[in-house]
A protein has these predicted regions:
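Alpha-helical elements of Rossmann-like donor-binding domains used by nucleotide-donor carbohydrate transfer enzymes
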Residues: 17-20, 45, 49, 101-104, ...
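Short beta-strand segments
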Residues: 4-7, 149-152, 186-188, 223
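Catalytic pocket-lining loop regions of alpha/beta-barrel enzymes
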Residues: 57, 70-186
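Mid-to-C-terminal alpha-helical segments outside catalytic/metal-binding sites
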Residues: 1-2, 174-175, 179-186, 195-227
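Mid-domain alpha/beta scaffold segments of enzyme catalytic cores
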Residues: 1-86, 131, 167, 205-207
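Active-site environment of divalent metal-dependent phosphoester hydrolases
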Residues: 10-13, 39-41, 64-66, 97-101, ...
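N-terminal cationic-hydrophobic initiation segments that often serve targeting/anchoring roles
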Residues: 22, 26, 51, 106-107, ...
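Divalent metal-coordination and catalytic microenvironments
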Residues: 18, 32, 59, 83, ...
């Protein structure tokens, strides 16, 4: 019964506040994937300072300053290398990034552990998964340092209110299971944002339903060991 928190705001004080907020129960709150501005002059200092608390385990890349030219900034690559050298993780929120970006980063930094958020940015419509998305998922998954979170299902649904039946989400979940397998899929609650689309219990029932026919070892890896 432990939790890795994702994420604070990009303010340093908010990252510190979250760590302080949960320090009373270190056995339950075992990690924070924080938010820092990659490619900025103080990134390395802030990451070093925050990581003095061992629960600060990684950074989520959310915004994309400079748009398409973001990865032309060598400071970005220097900071990503710094994360890798520290053996910390990089979460990638797919709203501003593509699976091609994931593939590029993973090839250039093969020792950096990458976690794609929110079912790899799938557009879920309750029908067979988009072939272009399938191809992009398989390409990214060929890199052994790339992992994927099953999170944000209700938010990725084109139909709102979001359906609560497994069959609506299963085409995309099948693709992710085939591509990443039991060792590189990770559960993410996306709480409290999940509550915009339904209750946490409804979300958990969908995910549990998908894993009902998987082995106990697979379920344990997905729900906690892979994290």
């Amino acid at each position: 019964n432990a939790t890795v928190i994702v994420e604070a705001s990009k303010w340093i004080s908010d990252n510190e506040w979250v760590l302080d907020l949960v320090k009373h129960d270190p056995d339950r709150y075992i990690g924070l994937v924080g938010s820092l501005e990659i490619g900025t002059p103080d990134f390395k200092k802030h990451l070093t300072d925050l990581s003095k608390d061992a629960r600060f385990v990684g950074v989520r890349m959310r915004e994309r300053p400079g748009g398409d030219s973001f990865f032309e900034n060598e400071a970005v690559w220097s900071d990503l290398q710094f994360i890798s050298d520290r053996n910390q993780t990089l979460d990638i929120l797919m709203f501003q990034y593509s699976l091609d970006d994931v593939d590029m980063i993973s090839k250039r930094l093969p020792k950096l552990k990458i976690l794609i958020n929110h079912v790899a940015g799938a557009d879920i419509e309750g029908k067979p998964a988009d072939p272009k998305w399938i191809a992009a998922v398989r390409k990214a998954a060929k890199n052994p340092n790339v992992n994927c979170k099953i999170s944000g299902l209700f938010q990725q649904s084109h139909r709102q209110p979001s359906p609560k039946n497994l069959s609506f989400y299963k085409p995309e979940l099948d693709v992710l299971w085939e591509a990443f397998g039991q060792d590189r899929l990770i559960y993410g609650s996306n709480w409290p944002v999940t509550m915009r689309g339904g209750t946490y219990g409804e979300y958990l029932r969908v995910v549990n339903g998908f894993f009902a026919d998987k082995s106990r070892a697979s379920r344990e890896k997905f729900f906690f060991k892979n994290a």
